[in-house]
């Protein structure tokens, strides 16, 4: 079953299952498709962005090695530079207190 949801063509799960390669080729060419289950939109098939493809290519070629344990950079805490006892945050806080 095909329908249009908003500006996106929507296809039923059965239709997708029977013709997956046809629909994936359309998505790879840049088209967006919606997937419905019993007439209700449940998923969107969107093309992978060029930046994501580049990253994957770099990983496959061994140039880029992804983190083993990725972290949120906001959770990383600053450590004092070698040989120093104060962090940059400490210095900035002191400068603010002097003003």
From Swiss-Prot:
* GO terms of biological process kind: positive regulation of growth
Highest taxon of the lineage = Bacteria
Gene3D superfamilies the UniProt entry points to: YefM-like domain
Keyword Lyase appears in the UniProt entry: no
Q: Name one Pfam family in it.
A: PhdYeFM_antitox
Keyword terms, alphabetized: Toxin-antitoxin system
Q: Does the keyword Plastid apply?
A: no
Molecular function terms in GO for this entry?
Answer: toxin sequestering activity
The record's similarity note reads: Belongs to the phD/YefM antitoxin family.
NCBIfam families in the record, alphabetically? Answer: phd_fam
Biological function = Antitoxin component of a type II toxin-antitoxin (TA) system. Upon expression in M.smegmatis neutralizes the effect of cognate toxin VapC47.
What is the protein named?
A: Antitoxin VapB47
Q: Which organism is it from?
A: Mycobacterium tuberculosis (strain ATCC 25618 / H37Rv)
Identify the gene encoding this protein: vapB47
